[in-house]
Structure formats: structure tokens, C-alpha cells
Swiss-Prot record:
Function of the protein: Component of the integrator complex, a multiprotein complex that terminates RNA polymerase II (Pol II) transcription in the promoter-proximal region of genes. The integrator complex provides a quality checkpoint during transcription elongation by driving premature transcription termination of transcripts that are unfavorably configured for transcriptional elongation: the complex terminates transcription by (1) catalyzing dephosphorylation of the C-terminal domain (CTD) of Pol II subunit Polr2A/Rbp1 and Spt5, and (2) degrading the exiting nascent RNA transcript via endonuclease activity.
Location(s), subcellular: Nucleus; Cytoplasm; Cytoplasm, Perinuclear region
Keyword Cell wall biogenesis/degradation appears in the UniProt entry: no
Domain of life of the organism encoding this protein: Eukaryota
Protein name: Protein asunder
Family indicated by similarity: Belongs to the Integrator subunit 13 family.
Motif Nuclear localization signal (NLS): positions: 601-607
Length: 674
């Protein structure tokens, strides 16, 4: 309800040091043409802002952005510290505006250089007042307290941004310790009666140590650090001319904002009305304007502006259109917009262009190289919004066809069977408890191939009269008669395989089953039958049927391997033995000779049962083994026992054998030695 960024307090150091110049000189030569030699040499037409002016301008610009994007929701206060703390505004809505703050800052004025150097001038007075201001409730918190919500349940967090200048890290450490001590004391005062304000749940202290341009500081930067459960502190050292960039960078994180630069804005030249030039305008808005638009096909073009340390998204200006309802595209969200440099001529021209009722479309590039209109700028009721347009498929578009999936067009899905399965599996609320409810999940199908060409069993159920009844019994309760009838059907199937009958396939849809022989088709059918029964073996009759099928496979020389007899892989719920990896193994069976068909078939079955755990190394190794099995190994490896070294050319150099071979060639016998 109450976020940390609801309360922000600026503590500005108003000591003598802030009266010195920032050493960034601005030219005052407004005459046309080249500057005179006297002005260039003497430098009389240049001036430099003081550290106080840089701090005031950047902090007021910070609160302008907050009040533009969150009108009436986020609160910013200012406290000026010298010999005492001077309160510039309060949490009241009447003082939360630019005119009140700027008039008060004019009355404060720049610190005087004749101010005495005394220990009474310190930023600590402002830090104490900031903690007291955090304990004061805002209008929203006061309403919550009036509605009866306990004070402990009202979250009170805030952020303090202190702009000062310290000598070294020791001075910064003392500021942290003093702030933490005062914070704890304030919570003690808020907890004890009479209560003085709300307790502070957490505070985020940001210390900006600013120095003139070209001066090295002995204070080191430090990221966010938790000092205590109540306090987080971060320190930034920055040059006075760059403090506005630093605060713009910080506000992006403080309020979850994003920066967008509209590029290539055509604008008439001020000095020559007949020509035009392209300008850029940077705007700030909620980060969600980009996050809800981008999809996987889009990338945000980002860049870093000169002098800044944060990224800005670059979007290109498109041809302006009317702001009618017919021209609007599907919109995902709209967010308020404010320019970064509100006083520049390009920003004022863009704002006036939008306030006159025109709209601007913005483009972003795709990964493919083309562009898409992703955002639109328009104004309503005197406020400018950025609209995030839908550049991907929206909910109003028709859903893509299930056939147009990855890997090509698939047109053999079992759509009607899937519809029947969904109707059978629908859930209906019951008034009373059903005693058979625990057994219902067991009766649901656990094996459902998605396509017709990935299964043999369900492909044949329209052509074998007994198969639909067989499949129905597998998922239902089975008695002894059903078990005997199913065993008879399995025996008839094996007899048909022994006779060499071909399975009644009406079509193969792309000749996916052509490489298989009739025997291999039956083996695929047996394997799928066993897999289906094994997944639904919940009763004694199902288990008896599974044992009889395995016994028949062993009797016909098609016994399952050890790995096949293990647990069924989870992928088998939606796959069949005709999945791509298994088809490759079956193709090798039909191509190889009949002598090696048994071993290759068993190897393919092992691959079928373990397909879910195969790696790329396993696939390459199995392919190399299948190639090496096609040729005989060397005789030395075959005849030599394991662990011994085979002798190369064992008959080479044997004189008796050489003489016998020569005599045999000449027809003369050689008597053996006694």
C-alpha cells in the first residue's frame, strides 16, 4: 500500500562551500555571427554556475519528473541546512508543486561567500529534520489511521537524498553513524507515549558528494550497503555539472522508470524556415511500456547519451497520424510521459505537436532486419501518454493451426480420439463422496500416441475386429473369461505371424512403414501390446495376460531383454515404438542380413526402452558399432587371447616352412629331421 518511494526528502547543504563556482563555463554571446576577438580573449561573455545552483536545479528537476509521472501519488520534500534546518515544503498537497518550491528556493538564495567558517554550519541539522519529516504522516497515511488501521500495520518507509560535500571517507562515516543514531532515537520516541509521529520501518539514504569540475575527491563511491535493519546507505561522488545526469540515473531505479529517445524528428530550422533537420528528444516513462511489448523476435536498441551513465532505448519517428479511434492499434497499456529536458526547443515542439491532437508512431527493429510499430505517443486531457502496441500475436487473432508445428506440417493427428479421451476424462463436481473415486485415475488411459503413423496398435483397431474390445478391457476391470478371451486373440495373432500373413494396413501415409518386413511389423505390434498391458497391469488378470504375452514372445524367439523388462520410461505415455529413433533402428533390421536380424532387433529394443537417456555420444558410438559389425575383424584379434599381444606375420622368417614351400613348388620332397 505504502511503498518506499512514496516519501522522498532532499537535504541540500547551504554552507559557504556551495557558493564557489562549478568551473563549467557557459557562453553568453547571443549575437549572430562569430564572437568578437575581445570577448573570446577576455572571457567576459562567460559565466559559471555555483555548486548551490547546480544542486537546486537538478533536485527540482528530479521532483518535476516525479510529479509529472505520479501526480498526487508520490511526495517530495526539500530541507535546506546551514546553521539550522529550513523546511521548504510539507507533505500537504498544497505545497507539493513546482511553483511553491521554486518561490521558496528564490527566498533562500545562494550561500554568501562572506559567511563565517563555523561548525554551526552543517548538513547534520538537515538530516535530523529529514528523519523527523519521515515520521510525519502523509495525507494517505492519516486517512488510513483515521479509518481504524493500527499504526503498526501502516508501512512507513522513505528515501533521503543528501547533496553535500565531504573531505574524506571518515567524514562520510560520521554522517552515516549520526544518521543511524538519530533514526533509532526517533523510533523510540514514536513508540513511547505520547507518540511523536509514525515509526520508521526502513530508510534509504543516498549521499551525493559533489565537487567542482576537475577537482579530485578523496571520497570513494560505494554501492548500496546495509548499515542496520533500518538503514541502507549508498555514496556517489560526482562533478557539479554532471549531477543532473546522476539524479536522472538514480530516478530510473527509484521509481522503476525507463528512458526512451525519439530519433529523427523532422523540425523546421529556426533561422531558415525552408529547411528542416532531424532532432532527438529523450522522454521518461514507466519501464513496463517496454517490457510488455517486447517478444522473443524483438530486441531493444539501446545507446548511452554523451555525459550520461544510463542506457536509453532508441525508437524512430514515423509519419504522424490523426488520433482517431479507427487509427489506433491493439494497445497493451498506456503510461504517462515527461521529457528529460523540458526547456529545450525540440522537447517543446514535440509537446506542442502532441497537445494539438496529433499522434506519433514509433518504430523498433526486429531481429530479422525489418521494423515494427511498437509504441505511440498521444495526448489526452493535457497529459501525454506512451501507448505500448501489440506487435506479437494477440488474443483477438486466430490461434495457429496445430498442424503448423515445428518440424514441418503434421496432418495425421488423432483428433477425434483425443476428443473422446477429453470427454471421458472430464471432471464433474459431486454432492456426495463417491466410494469408487480412488480407482478412477487407474482407469484413465496411460498410453496415447498423438499421431496415427507413430503407432501400429491403434492404427489397426479399425481393421481387426477383436482389437477395440481388447483395448477396452485393458483399462477396465477384467475377469477370468476376459483374460482367456484376450489370450486367445494373442495366440491367433502369433499364428497369423507364423503363417506369414500381412497386417491389414490400408495406408502408410508417406510410406513410413514400407521398409519393414511382415515379421518386423508383428514384432512392433507385440512390443506395443506389451507396453500397453504393462502400463495398465493393475489386477491379477492383467498381470497374467502380461506373463502369457512375454512367454509367447520367448517361445517364438522374440524374448524381451533385461532392460526391456524394467520399468517403462515416462516418455512412453505419449510415444510408441514407431517414434523417429525407433524407426531408424527398425530400418536397420530390414536392411541387414537375416543372420544378424535377431541381435540388431534386440539392440533396437534396448534403444527403445532407454531412448529418454541417450546422449549424443551414445548415438555416435552405436552408429560406429553398427558400421564395424558389417566387416570381419583381423584374425590376430580373433585368435589371440585377451591380455596377450598378437604377433605380426608369425610365419615370416621360418626356414623349414620356406624350404617346404619351395620344394612343394618344384616337386621335390624334403625329409624331416629326426
Amino acid at each position: 500500500m505504502f511503498e518506499r518511494n512514496q516519501k522522498t526528502i532532499f537535504v541540500l547543504d547551504h554552507t559557504r562551500y556551495f557558493s564557489i563556482a562549478s568551473e563549467e563555463y557557459i557562453s553568453m554571446d547571443f549575437l549572430k555571427g562569430k564572437p568578437s576577438a575581445h570577448s573570446s580573449a577576455g572571457g567576459s561573455s562567460q559565466f559559471s554556475k555555483s555548486l548551490w545552483t547546480c544542486a537546486c536545479e537538478s533536485s527540482i528537476e528530479y521532483c518535476r519528473v516525479v510529479w509529472d509521472l505520479f501526480p498526487g501519488k508520490k511526495h517530495v520534500r526539500f530541507i535546506v541546512s546551514d546553521t539550522a534546518a529550513h523546511i521548504v515544503n510539507t507533505w500537504s498537497a498544497s505545497t507539493q508543486n513546482m511553483s511553491h518550491v521554486m518561490n521558496a528556493m528564490v527566498m533562500v538564495g545562494v550561500p554568501s561567500r562572506s559567511m563565517p567558517q563555523s561548525s554551526d554550519y552543517s548538513v547534520i541539522h538537515g538530516l535530523r529534520a529529514a528523519i523527523e519529516a519521515l515520521a510525519e504522516p502523509t495525507d494517505e497515511q492519516s486517512q488510513a489511521m483515521a479509518s481504524g488501521i493500527p499504526d503498526d500495520l501502516i508501512l512507513n518507509e522513505g528515501r533521503v537524498i543528501c547533496i553535500t560535500s565531504a573531505r574524506d571517507n571518515t567524514s562520510m562515516k560520521s554522517l552515516e553513524d549520526i544518521f543511524n543514531t538519530v533514526l533509532i532515537q526517533q523510533n523510540v520516541l514514536s513508540a513511547t507515549p505520547p507518540k511523536k509521529g509514525l515509526g520508521i520501518n526502513h530508510c534509504h539514504l543516498v549521499i551525493l558528494n559533489i565537487v567542482p569540475l576537475g577537482i579530485d575527491s578523496m571520497v570513494t563511491n560505494r554501492n548500496l550497503l546495509e548499515i542496520s535493519p533500518l538503514l541502507d546507505v549508498e555514496i556517489h561522488t560526482v562533478g557539479a555539472p554532471d549531477i543532473s545526469y546522476k539524479l536522472t540515473h538514480l530516478i530510473l531505479d527509484h521509481y522503476d522508470l525507463a528512458s526512451t529517445t525519439v530519433t529523427n524528428i523532422p523540425m523546421k530550422e529556426e533561422q531558415n524556415a525552408n529547411s528542416s533537420a532531424n532532432y532527438d528528444v529523450e522522454i521518461l516513462h514507466s519501464r513496463r511500456a517496454h517490457s510488455i511489448t517486447c517478444g522473443p523476435d524483438f530486441s531493444l536498441p539501446t545507446s548511452i547519451k554523451q555525459g550520461a551513465t544510463y542506457e536509453t532505448v532508441t525508437l524512430k519517428w514515423c509519419t504522424p497520424r490523426g488520433c482517431g479511434s479507427a487509427d489506433l492499434q491493439p494497445c497493451l497499456g498506456q503510461f504517462l510521459v515527461t521529457p528529460v529536458d523540458v526547456t529545450s526547443r525540440p522537447s517543446s515542439c514535440l509537446i506542442n505537436f502532441l497537445l494539438n491532437g496529433r499522434s506519433v508512431l514509433l518504430e523498433m527493429p526486429r531481429k530479422t532486419g525489418s521494423k515494427a510499430t511498437s509504441h505511440m505517443l498521444s495526448a489526452r486531457g493535457g497529459e501525454i501518454f506512451i501507448h505500448s502496441l501489440c506487435i506479437t500475436r494477440s488474443c483477438m487473432d486466430e490461434a495457429p493451426s496445430i498442424a503448423d508445428g515445428p518440424g514441418g506440417r503434421v496432418n495425421d493427428y488423432r483428433t477425434s480420439e483425443l476428443g473422446q479421451l477429453m470427454k471421458m476424462s472430464r471432471m464433474v463436481p459431486l454432492k456426495s463422496r463417491d466410494p469408487a473415486a480412488p480407482n478412477l485415475p487407474r482407469r484413465l488411459p496411460r498410453y496415447f500416441p498423438l499421431t496415427t503413423t507413430s503407432t501400429v496398435l491403434f492404427h489397426l483397431q479399425r481393421h481387426l475386429s477383436w482389437l477395440p474390445h481388447f483395448l477396452h478391457l485393458l483399462v477396465k476391470e477384467m475377469d477370468k473369461q476376459d483374460e482367456v478371451r484376450c489370450q486367445q486373440h494373442i495366440h491367433e495373432l502369433y499364428k497369423s505371424a507364423s503363417r506369414g500373413d500381412v497386417l491389414p494396413f490400408t495406408h502408410t501415409n508417406g510410406a513410413r512403414l514400407k521398409p519393414h518386413k511382415a515379421k518386423d511389423q508383428y514384432r512392433l505390434l507385440y512390443r506395443e501390446l506389451e507396453q500397453l498391458i504393462q502400463l495398465n497391469a493393475s489386477t491379477v488378470h492383467h498381470k497374467n495376460l502380461l506373463e502369457s504375452l512375454q512367454t509367447l514372445r520367448a517361445a517364438y524367439g522374440d524374448a524381451p531383454s533385461k532392460s526391456e523388462a524394467g520399468t517403462v520410461n515416462l516418455r512412453s505415455f505419449t510415444e510408441s515404438p514407431l517414434s523417429p529413433e525407433r524407426l531408424e533402428a527398425m530400418s536397420n533390421v530390414s536392411i541387414s542380413s537375416s543372420t544378424n536380424s535377431n541381435s540388431l532387433l534386440k539392440a533396437s529394443k534396448r534403444r527403445m526402452s532407454n531412448c529418454g537417456t541417450r546422449s549424443l555420444l551414445d548415438i555416435i558410438s552405436s552408429a560406429e558399432r553398427s558400421q564395424s559389425n558389417k566387416r570381419l575383424d583381423f584374425s590376430g584379434r580373433i585368435c589371440t587371447p585377451i591380455g596377450q599381444i598378437a604377433k605380426l606375420y608369425p610365419d615370416f622368417g621360418n626356414k623349414e616352412k620356406d624350404a617346404a614351400a619351395a620344394a612343394a613348388a618344384s616337386g621335390v620332397g624334403v625329409a624331416p629331421k629326426e
